[in-house]
């Protein structure tokens, strides 16, 4: 039985759409196109004010790998503090060594700091870049995290079903395994049935056109292939379809 349908969002508009679709928890990010980075303090504050379901903030200071230095560790501490001050329910984090193991000193520092503030912890898909998933699972359990977000080390959760099933069996209820990456209404039911995961994670993304009446075509705000006047948002229907498939 699925206990949580988590939706990742990167704007406040999507918060309302995700909850309307049946999200039971929100992962709050910026820049989902980069895999999700730390949201702003203002976004955390507004989400805490508006949400009727638990909200966990992504704690990821930059794009790229999950091997961080001391300065970045300090930044993550400040961001965890911001999540607490905003009234959020938890944080989502992950730190690795250069060799692809859980960075025990850094992970311990971050987890103990978050736990002392009363925040729940999800270990994110840095797990999927570990060299030894079985050992990483035990390390994360020892850290006291509530769950691991993982695709089963594969490009998508459906492709990682066999590993997801093994992780659930190894965990034996000591930690939740949350399947994420490529989850949709067409595969969610079979994914849960085949792996016994109790939590699933998705973005349910679509886009809407800009509401501006003047469209400037002479400049770009970022990459040339990104349409500045197409706003990525969560599709309420996409989330509702997954929720229905899981009933």
From Swiss-Prot:
Belongs to the CutC family. It comes from Vibrio parahaemolyticus serotype O3:K6 (strain RIMD 2210633). One of its GO terms (molecular function) is copper ion binding. InterPro entries: CutC-like, CutC-like_dom_sf. It comes from the Bacteria. It is found in: Cytoplasm. The keyword Cytoplasm applies. This is PF03932 family protein CutC. The gene is cutC. Pfam families: CutC (PF03932). The keyword Nucleus does not apply. Coiled coil: none annotated. Keywords: Cytoplasm. GO terms for cellular component: cytoplasm.
């Amino acid at each position: 039985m699925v206990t949580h349908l988590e939706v990742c969002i990167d704007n406040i508009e999507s918060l309302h759409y995700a909850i309307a679709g049946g999200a039971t928890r929100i992962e709050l990010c910026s820049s989902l196109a980069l895999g999700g980075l730390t949201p702003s303090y203002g976004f955390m504050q507004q989400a805490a004010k508006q949400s009727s379901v638990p909200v966990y903030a992504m704690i990821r200071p930059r794009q790229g790998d999950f091997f961080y230095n001391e300065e970045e560790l300090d930044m993550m501490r400040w961001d965890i503090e911001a999540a607490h001050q905003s009234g959020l329910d938890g944080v989502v984090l992950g730190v690795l060594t250069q060799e692809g193991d859980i960075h025990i000193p850094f992970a311990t520092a971050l987890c103990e700091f978050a736990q002392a503030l009363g925040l729940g912890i999800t270990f994110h898909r840095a797990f999927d870049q570990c060299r030894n998933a079985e050992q990483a699972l035990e390390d994360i359990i020892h850290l006291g995290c509530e769950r691991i977000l993982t695709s089963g080390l594969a490009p998508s959760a459906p492709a990682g079903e066999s590993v997801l099933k093994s992780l659930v069996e190894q965990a034996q209820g000591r930690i939740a395994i949350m399947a994420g990456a490529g989850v949709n209404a067409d595969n969610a039911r079979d994914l849960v049935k085949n792996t016994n995961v109790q939590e699933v994670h998705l973005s349910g993304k679509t886009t809407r056109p800009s509401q501006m009446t003047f469209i400037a075509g002479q400049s770009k705000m970022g990459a040339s292939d990104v349409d500045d006047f197409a706003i990525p948002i969560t599709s309420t229907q996409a989330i509702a379809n997954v929720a229905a498939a899981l009933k």
